[in-house]
């Protein structure tokens, strides 16, 4: 009891010390811990357009491999927190084939994954080129390799999980909604299915996206091939998607880079064009890639902080590399083995009705 009383007295005297010091003009250093103000983090999402397994692309890859395809934008792909591409071919099995009825080798998406692509958009008009059996095999092969995809589903249960696809990226919950205007080959009424550009079917998908995610990214496969500007149907659909909760819209299918506009705070990239193909038309060789930056801060809702489009150019074998390569248009001319192709790229850029960079920083 005596020891307890002594401790109480000691504590009391310590409490009186600051008061005594103040009376004598003595300052006692007292530091109070202050929580640092939360700093915003940025989640970077990188998207490219259509990856096509044209016959000559596959022939070239058989001779030279895939390594040159995205060699010049590897830093963009791997530097992003999430990279997305439109895989516009099914894995329908042998014999492999290019346009007009695609069936690509399994090694192609394996390479795309190795180079850094994290999510594959399968909701496009070529995914049923080998019919429902080809789509079933595509899903099976993607699952077997652990590759994330959206836009299609093998069953009703899978459809709920994959459409939308919810991805956690550095704490950001991102919903990816992918669908197509139609398919070149018909589909059976049973599973597997492709997500269609149908408002009644998309309403529950968008509702799940709003409920489960912080940000809703919509990737529609739409529009008219080779048209450099969007049409009324695309614009009307974009406005409907925004009303349904879309924060960003990045489209594909036209095989050319289309115009872009801001609808309020929502950027709408109507088409990024191709990412890799054997198409010869000059507008189709000009490609787009988008980098999106989402600011995240503890206690605040994540929001779009930056959106930037850069131009790429699809080079054929012998122009820059032995095989195909998507290269930034800013790449110096010294990289070209074929100077005429560099001049062609510059002329195409000058004649394009698209502004090279759309940015919101």
Residue ranges and their predicted role:
Residues 1-9:
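Bacterial N-terminal signal peptides that target proteins for export
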Residues 10-20:
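Bacterial N-terminal signal peptides
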Residues 24-361:
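Acidic, metal/ion-coordinating pockets
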Residues 5, 19-20, 84:
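Intrinsically disordered, low-complexity segments enriched in glycine/proline and serine/threonine
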């Amino acid at each position: 009891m005596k020891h307890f009383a002594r401790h109480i007295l000691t504590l009391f005297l310590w409490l009186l010390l600051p008061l005594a010091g103040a009376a004598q003009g003595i300052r006692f250093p007292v530091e109070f811990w202050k929580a640092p103000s939360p700093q915003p983090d940025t989640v970077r999402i990188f998207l490219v357009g259509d990856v096509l397994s044209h016959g000559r692309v596959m022939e070239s890859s058989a001779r030279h491999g895939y390594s040159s395809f995205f060699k010049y934008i590897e830093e963009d792909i791997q530097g992003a927190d999430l990279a997305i591409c439109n895989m516009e071919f099914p894995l329908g099995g042998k014999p492999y084939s290019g346009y007009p009825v695609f069936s690509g080798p399994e090694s192609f998406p394996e390479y795309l994954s190795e180079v850094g692509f994290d999510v594959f958009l399968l909701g496009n008009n070529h995914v049923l080129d080998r019919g429902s059996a080809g789509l079933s095999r595509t899903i099976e092969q993607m699952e077997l390799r652990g590759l994330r995809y959206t836009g299609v589903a093998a069953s009703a249960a899978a459809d709920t999980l994959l459409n939308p696809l919810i991805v956690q990226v550095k704490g950001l919950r991102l919903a990816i909604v992918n669908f197509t205007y139609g398919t070149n080959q018909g589909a059976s009424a049973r599973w597997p299915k492709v997500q269609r550009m149908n408002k009644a079917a998309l309403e529950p998908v968008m509702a799940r996206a709003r409920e489960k995610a912080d940000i809703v990214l919509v990737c529609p496969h739409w529009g008219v091939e080779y048209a450099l500007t969007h049409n009324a149907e695309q614009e009307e659909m974009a406005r409907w998607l925004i009303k349904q909760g879309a924060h960003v819209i990045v489209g594909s299918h036209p095989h050319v880079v289309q115009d872009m506009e801001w609808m309020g705070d929502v950027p709408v990239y109507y088409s990024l064009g191709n990412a890799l193909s054997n198409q010869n038309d000059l507008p189709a060789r000009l490609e787009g890639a988008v980098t999106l930056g989402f600011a995240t801060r503890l206690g605040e809702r994540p929001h779009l902080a930056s959106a930037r489009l850069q131009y790429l150019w699809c080079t054929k074998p012998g122009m820059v590399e032995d095989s195909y390569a998507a290269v930034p248009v800013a790449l110096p001319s010294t990289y070209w083995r074929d100077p005429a192709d560099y001049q062609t790229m510059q002329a195409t850029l000058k004649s394009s009705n698209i502004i090279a960079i759309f940015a919101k920083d």
